[in-house]
Amino acid sequence: MKTTKALSIFMLVFALLLGACQRNVTRNGDGSADVETIVTQQELQEAVNASVADPLIKELTVSLQSGYILVSGTRERLNDSSKTDTLSFRIDLGVSNGQLTSTISDAQFDGFTIEQNRLDLWNTTIANRIAKLGQKSPNSTLDSVSITTSEVTMTWTVSK
């Protein structure tokens, strides 16, 4: 009875973990596996919102374009919350040494360039959060990432 209960709990937890994003697995002859994970626009929206983590930034919207991600929103002014500035930036995702990279460009508050140290922090946290959505094994390396108007697809090699 205990074994059946433990197995049922394990299967439930496993199903919940797999439900986070879609994945396809292909076994290779050397014992490794190629895993393709798909991250939805909603999952990206949540990852970018959490990465920006600025209480003054409101209504952040993630829009998937062919090859990149467009982000827009508003930011309350620190000295006058009744006034807002528009925020926009582009995110390009890539792969370097088996890890996901994020590169923000064209980042502006009301036409003024956003400071680089803020962009560096956002790049790091965005890449880490999106990678966590797709990478489910610590012994995996990212091979490729692609962005379409409906999803982000990452292909990983998982070694045994």
Stretch-by-stretch model annotation:
Residues 1-19:
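Sec-dependent bacterial lipoprotein signal peptides
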